[in-house]
Regions:
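Short, well-ordered loop/turn and helix-capping segments at boundaries between secondary-structure elements
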Residues: 31-32, 52, 60, 82, ...
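RNase H-like two-metal-ion nuclease catalytic core shared by retroviral integrases
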Residues: 11-13, 17-26, 33-59
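C-terminal accessory regions appended to core domains
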Residues: 105-171
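Short, solvent-exposed helix-loop connector elements
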Residues: 57-73, 95-96
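Charged, gly/pro-enriched flexible loop segments at helix/strand junctions
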Residues: 78-119
């Protein structure tokens, strides 16, 4: 569950993202579905970057059997999402236009913040929150653990997760 309103869902052309179940759910939630152009590898550079830094870095490159999906989803929803959104900084580029009108993206020290800090930095950020979600409640989540505490908790959680699912691969 996201604390903010989702207006649009952008996917590549893969059937794992565009199928009857997903389309039906998005229609029911009044969320617009857009997709990438076929065979345009740079359309989803940000998604592919996140896939590498989030999924592959933390779960590895091996095949994950579908039967392990529920326990992996629990790991992501129970602990990892808090780490990712409230404690792990990301770079948000500043766009600079040169004399010729070309836009260049640069990363200044102040451009590094967590996704939650970025949300808070937006003008009228409260307008983007789901009903019943407040900045104060999200602040409590952000402050209940230090960066080191949550990082240690995530590492322990991943260790326990791999101990549950990896024996299935070794047999």
């Amino acid at each position: 569950k996201f604390p903010f309103k989702v207006f649009e869902f952008h996917a590549d052309n893969g059937s794992e993202y565009i199928n009857r179940v997903i389309v039906s759910m998005l229609n029911k939630l009044l969320i617009k579905l857009t997709k990438s152009r076929s065979r345009q590898t740079n359309d989803n550079a940000q998604v592919e970057s996140k896939n590498g830094s989030i999924i592959r870095k933390w779960m590895g490159y091996g095949f994950i059997d579908q039967k392990h999906a529920p326990v992996i989803n629990d790991f992501y929803f129970d602990i990892f999402n808090e780490y990712l959104n409230f404690h792990r900084p990301c770079g948000f580029a500043t766009e600079i236009t040169d004399k010729k009108g070309k836009i260049k993206k640069v990363y200044k020290p102040q451009d590094y913040m967590t996704p939650y800090e970025k949300l808070k930095s937006l003008t009228n950020c409260r307008l983007y929150l789901e009903a019943g979600i407040t900045i104060e409640a999200l602040d409590k989540i952000a402050k209940r653990k230090t960066d080191n505490e949550i990082a240690s908790e995530v590492q322990d959680g991943r260790y326990k997760l791999f101990n549950k699912i990896l024996p299935a691969y070794s047999s």
